[in-house]
Amino acid sequence: MKLSEKFCVFLFFLLFTSTTHATGIGSLKSFMENARTVRADFAQTVLDKSRHIVQTASGAMQFERPGKFRWIYEKPYEQLIVGDGERIWFYDHDLAQVTVRKLDAAIGSSPAALLAGNNDIEKNFHLLEIGLQGNIEWVEATPKTRESTFERVLLGFTLEGILRVMELHDNFGQVTVFEFSGVEQNRKLPPELFKFSPPAGVDVISE
């Protein structure tokens, strides 16, 4: 099964904050203010509505505000997603195909909109403090618009304010879980990471 673009496109701005906070909402708001660049590894698990595992994947990502990111799936399939600040490029190595979209159209009212760029989180999302479970503080973000692909997003922060887990709950009962490790925050990233030119011979589809 190929990895679904709808899960990839919402995750490029997922970063981490190292500031200590007492609540999930406080950590989320601090993340919005303080996370400028990030490099991290991720493990992804997709669960169906019966909570059976239907897909796993892993890879790495880099991010630089505003709107620049590089998201690499290494297993089970090679896929590359690059945001250059204006467009998002999806490159599927096996299919020899590139899909390109405008950044605003691709993100919309989504988890990326929740985490990207400005601090006006509650303009587009209802935030609910879930509380401490184990050593993780959880916050729930629900889109105010009915046009969102996702019903809700759960964000889990450590007690030190580091974002470790994100769960995307879609409108069909499917859940995509991302767990993050090897976080490097606010380091200078090479500009070339956020540029993409389609390889020769691949099909390019504009949406």
UniProtKB/Swiss-Prot annotation:
Mention any one GO cellular component term assigned to this protein in its UniProt record: periplasmic space
Give me the gene this protein comes from.
Answer: lolA
Where does the record place it?
A: Periplasm
Question: Which terms are listed as keywords in the entry?
Answer: Chaperone, Periplasm, Protein transport, Signal, Transport
Record function comment: Participates in the translocation of lipoproteins from the inner membrane to the outer membrane. Only forms a complex with a lipoprotein if the residue after the N-terminal Cys is not an aspartate (The Asp acts as a targeting signal to indicate that the lipoprotein should stay in the inner membrane).
GO biological process annotation, one example: lipoprotein transport
Summary of subunit composition and partner proteins: Monomer.
Q: Where are the transmembrane segments?
A: none
Query: Taxonomic lineage of this organism?
Result: Bacteria, Pseudomonadati, Pseudomonadota, Betaproteobacteria, Nitrosomonadales
- What is the superkingdom listed in this entry's lineage? Bacteria
**Main location as per UniProt:** periplasm
Q: Does the keyword Ion transport apply?
A: no
Known SUPFAM superfamilies for this protein? Answer: Prokaryotic lipoproteins and lipoprotein localization factors (SSF89392)
- Name this polypeptide is given: Outer-membrane lipoprotein carrier protein
Q: What family is reported?
A: Belongs to the LolA family.
Which residues constitute the signal peptide according to the record? 1-22
- Return the InterPro entries for the record: LolA/LolB/LppX, OM_lipoprot_carrier_LolA-like, OM_lipoprot_carrier_LolA_Pbac
